[in-house]
Amino acid sequence: GSNLEHHALAASTALQANQVVATPMGNPTHYGDPKDGCRPDEAQTTIQGVAGDLCTPRCSLFTPCPTDTPPGVAAQPQCALEDARSLQKFCALLCSTSLPILDQRAADAQCGEKASCKAVQAGIGLCTYDD
C-alpha cells in the first residue's frame, strides 16, 4: 500500500503545508509535477493557503538544493520551506523575491508551462503546479 506521511511545512514564517511521500518514479529532474511522480529524494508538498503542489527535495545547511530544474524553468531553487514539526527543510522554486508579484505573467513564465508563481506568507513567490 502507499505510505502516507503528513508534514506541516513553513516558508520561514508560519506557512503550513501537507506533504505526501510520493512514488519513486516519473520526473526526469527535481521540482517536477507531482502528477508525474516525484523523485525518490523528494516529497510531494502542498503549502497551506496556496493552490497547487510541487515536488520538493530536502535541503539543509550542508545539503544544497539540487539545481536540475524541468525544461523551461528559470525560477531559482531555494531552501525555502520548513517542516514545523521535524524542522526538516525543503527546496522550492523561487519565482519572486518580493510581494506583491509585480508582473504575474513574467513570474509565471519562470515556473515553466504547467506551473505558476504563487505568493506565500514569507513575502516571496514560489512555483506550484496547478493540474
Model regions: which residues?
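Secreted, cysteine-rich disulfide-bonded mini-domains of extracellular proteins
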Residues: N3-D131
